[in-house]
Regions:
Chain A
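Intrinsically disordered, Ser/Thr-rich regulatory regions of eukaryotic membrane-trafficking proteins
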Residues: 1-413
Length: 413, 442
């Protein structure tokens, strides 16, 4: 049967309503999985009511080689059956992003509708989103779940300030967010005063640009819901791809009738950016960052997250970009993610972290460091033969370099 | 696992069928269920839980050839294990309500696969110790008796489970030098030589194992029951009456200053049959004298009173010397205080050494060390193994070292702002002195 083929996949996702109606599945046809989804819904219900008078929620199920993780929202349920070695937290994050993507496509009105009409068939509403959902899963799986930020491209501060000036000179009051970005990286972001940008919203926008090829062929006007801005309605996105380039200018407005204004604003920004196109392309071309560019020879890989900027930088690859430099083969990156998770894990419990945390894990073939404090989080990989005192010095030097380099690494607030 | 009470526990055999000619649906459901705790749970709930457990086992078969191990909800952890052919045991642990915005929960620090497995194994093995395999109980004639035994046993298990404080299942070895050890061995061999009915012996002094001739798993079972974590004191406090028809776990006579606990004593002749892995069922005698416990496993299924008296006379003669040999060494080591907090565990011979300063281990530190240990165990199964780790949290520094994949050593220092290399230096200095006979790789 078709569904048994999809069960043999290494990582399978199911989205369905609380009434057991399939909404989306990563592999196979939702229709073929109706019986299976029905049984999963029954399982979830039984565990919710396992003891009479007590409400509970199923989180995950384990066998020796499979983890099945559940995310239950008000009206939609998400399940992942994972046979590779990803951590439970990482899988849960992917489910969370799937949910964010569904809300991004339909707004939270889908929840209201499904609560009032539990038997509603929501499959058609998600039509055409398969590749974007799949892309979202792949990108999220490459992220560290505890890094709550996005990873911009590196650019000298003065050049980024020039882009900021261009935006400042041309922005329209209807614009909530403005971006100069590629499918993988954010180069510059503008936000309206007193409006923040949540990293999940940034990821959703990036996913939109990446997944819909049609946005690259012509100037587009498309709705998107950014749940952390507001999950009740859409923002309207004006997107254009600069000529002979892979640089997008993206403007978002909460005014559905602001197409003309955003078009004018966007064209003006594009015209002024034309003179900086080479500079911008240079900043993209140097991504991902080779580790040697940070002047610390002994480090094989690092991830640095600045809490002030809410942004991160990573060497060797980037979660949004599936390119791996020779210094970081893909298989090793997957192993390293698991090791970073392990190094970071204790600090996720309030009883063990009060603003200062260090962990050094020494494997036979690698040494992994995690430093977490109120300013930043650093995870680094080095050779296992490096003594701990040398490792401390290296990390200290790396942090110093990165701190100094922050204005060029990250987009200013 | 500390602190988590049992919400429910049940044993079932999905292959059992009702015996009546036209069984009802309820009869089908009831006959599968061998035992359910708590017994006052509504029948409907009991049947649902068994059905759900069966269903979950079948559900995961669609994705994995390996059996279902555990189910984690926000408030509970369900552990499922097939303990014998067609017999499943399910234990549901209650973690209480700890609302959290994030996915992780505090219980995740304690619900590692090996910890959950140990809980189920512990339940099963301690029942097995006194009553043998569940498959020995014939369906349906022996099942009411089995149910009574499980009922009696499970109540004790439920009270006992959250009080278990040890991190590792192993042996605390008695500190004896070579000469003293050989003297003790001589004494024990005299007993075995004189009494050919004695199949195996185990000698324990104040909760520390001195010697055992049993295979490792059997030794661990008996040692855990009688000695680990001073368990004999818990057994005495239980004050369970000596009912030969009830579950024998925890039913012991008062510990005399010198005499038999299992054997002939003021309560009569009590010689339980014990079932141990790799050994045929045998009778167990337990002789106590001062801080010593001497276990004798007898070959024969019957141990007459005369045999017990003959053994008593031998032990009167031989034990004082054994105790004297051990006592002087033991007191010397006991009175010395370790300068560091550490915990040592050897996965091969299951030796545990916990420094005097690390006793007792508070709950937060317990969870920390437990999770570090789980990370070290986990890594050997997947990638290149984790051999050393140093972690600073706000409650302590912990450094763990794994030596030759079998030994784990944990060092604990108070929290401080010292850099990690300074902490490591301090620990290495201590370790190179204290563990000088072991290659630690430090």
């Amino acid at each position: 049967m078709e569904h048994t083929k999809s069960f043999s996949k290494k990582k399978q996702f199911f989205v369905f309503t609380s009434a057991g109606k399939p909404v989306w599945t990563r592999y196979g046809d939702e229709t073929d999985l109706t019986t299976f989804i029905g049984s999963v819904t029954a399982i979830l219900y039984n565990f919710q009511q396992y003891y009479r008078g007590e409400q509970d929620t199923l989180r995950f199920i384990k066998t020796k080689d499979v983890n099945i993780v559940f995310l239950c929202t008000q009206a939609l349920y998400y399940v992942c059956v994972c046979k590779n070695n990803e951590t439970i937290e990482s899988i849960y994050q992917q489910l969370g992003m799937l949910h964010s993507k569904v809300i991004s496509t339909l707004t939270n009105n889908i929840t209201t509708m499904l609560i009032s009409r539990p038997n509603y068939d929501a499959r058609n509403l998600m039509g055409g989103t398969h590749s974007s959902l799949d892309c979202m899963i792949k990108t999220t799986a490459r992220c560290l779940h505890f890094i709550k930020g996005f990873g911009p491209s590196r650019m000298p501060l003065n050049q980024r300030n020039m882009i900021a000036s261009i935006f400042k000179n041309n922005i329209h009051s209807d614009v909530v967010y403005g971006f100069v970005m590629t499918t993988n990286y954010v180069i510059y972001r503008y936000t309206r005063k007193n409006v923040g940008l949540h990293h999940i919203d940034a990821a959703l926008l990036s996913n939109l640009i990446t997944s819909y090829i049609s946005l690259r062929s012509t100037m587009s006007w498309t709705p998107i819901c950014l749940p952390h801005f507001s999950d009740e309605g859409f923002l309207y996105t004006w997107v254009t791809l600069m000529q002979e380039s892979n640089i997008f200018i993206v403007l978002l407005s909460d005014n559905a009738s602001a197409f003309k204004e955003l078009k004018t604003c966007g064209n003006a920004i594009e015209a002024e950016l034309e003179s900086m196109k080479l500079v911008v392309e240079e900043s993209i071309a140097c991504m991902p960052h080779p580790v040697y560019t940070f002047d610390v020879k002994e480090v094989n890989h690092f991830v640095y997250f600045s809490k002030y900027y809410d942004q991160f930088v990573m060497s060797g690859t980037h979660p949004a970009n599936f390119v791996h430099l020779p210094e970081l083969p893909k298989e090793h990156y997957q192993e390293l993610m698991i090791r970073y998770n392990q190094a970071h894990s204790f600090s996720e419990y309030a009883e063990y972290y009060k603003g200062n945390y260090t962990k050094v894990d020494v494997y036979r073939n690698e040494l992994v460091v995690c430093i977490r404090n109120q300013e930043y989080e650093l995870l680094a990989s080095m050779s296992s033969i490096i003594p701990i005192n040398t490792c401390v010095q290296i990390c200290s030097q790396l942090c110093k370099t990165l701190k100094q380099e922050e204005p060029n690494l990250f987009i200013p607030k | 696992m500390r602190g988590s009470a049992i919400s429910s526990l049940f044993v079932f055999n999905p292959t059992l069928k009702p015996l009546s000619e036209h069984p009802t649906e309820d009869e089908y459901k009831s006959c599968k269920l061998i035992y359910y705790y708590p017994e006052n749970a509504p029948l409907f709930e009991q049947h649902t839980h068994v059905g759900l457990a069966e269903g979950m086992c079948m559900f995961v078969q669609q994705f994995s050839d390996n059996p279902l191990e555990s189910i984690h909800t926000e408030k509970h952890t369900h552990i499922l294990q097939q303990c014998e052919p067609n017999i499943w045991l399910c234990i549901v642990l209650n973690h209480g309500d700890s609302p959290s915005e994030s996915f992780i929960r505090q219980q995740d620090l304690e619900t590692h696969p090996h910890v959950l497995k140990a809980i189920v194994d512990n339940y099963y093995r301690n029942f097995y110790l006194f009553h043998g395999p569940l498959t020995n109980f014939r369906y349906p004639e022996d099942f009411p008796h089995l149910k009574n035994l499980l009922s009696d046993y499970t109540k004790i298990f439920d009270e006992d489970q959250p009080k278990r404080t040890e991190l590792f299942e192993g042996f605390a070895y008695c500190p004896l030098d070579r000469k003293s050890y050989m003297n003790v061995m001589y004494g024990l061999s005299q007993i075995s030589f004189t009494h050919t009915d004695v199949l195996h012996t185990m000698l324990i002094y104040d909760g520390y194992i001195v010697n055992t001739s049993m295979p490792q798993q059997g030794s661990l079972l008996v040692y855990s029951y009688l000695a680990r974590d001073k368990n004999w004191r818990r057994l005495i406090d239980m004050k369970r009456d000596l009912n030969p028809n009830a579950c024998q776990y925890g039913r012991i006579a008062e510990y005399p200053k010198k005499g038999f606990v299992y054997g002939k004593n003021s309560a009569g002749i009590i010689v339980p049959t014990v079932y141990l892995p790799d050994i045929p069922p045998c009778k167990m005698l337990l002789w106590v004298q001062e801080n010593m416990q001497l276990v004798l496993l007898m070959k024969n299924q019957e141990v007459p009173e005369e045999t017990i008296e003959v053994i008593r006379n031998s032990l009167h003669e031989l034990c004082p010397d054994i105790i004297k040999t051990i006592q002087s060494q033991y007191q010397r080591v006991l009175n010395s205080e370790d300068s560091f907090k550490f915990l040592y565990f050897n996965n091969m011979n299951l030796a545990i050494k916990q420094s005097s300063k690390l006793n007792p281990i508070d709950d937060q530190l317990y969870r920390l060390i437990l999770t570090v240990s789980a990370q070290m165990r986990d890594s050997t199964q997947k990638y290149d193994s984790l051999v050393k780790t140093i972690v600073r949290t706000n409650i302590a520094w912990v450094m763990a070292v794994k030596v030759l994949d079998s030994r784990e050593i944990y060092f604990v220092l108070p929290p401080s702002t010292a850099p990690v290399n300074k902490v490591e230096e301090e620990i290495v200095k201590f370790a190179n002195g204290y563990f000088h006979t072991i290659f630690t790789g430090l």
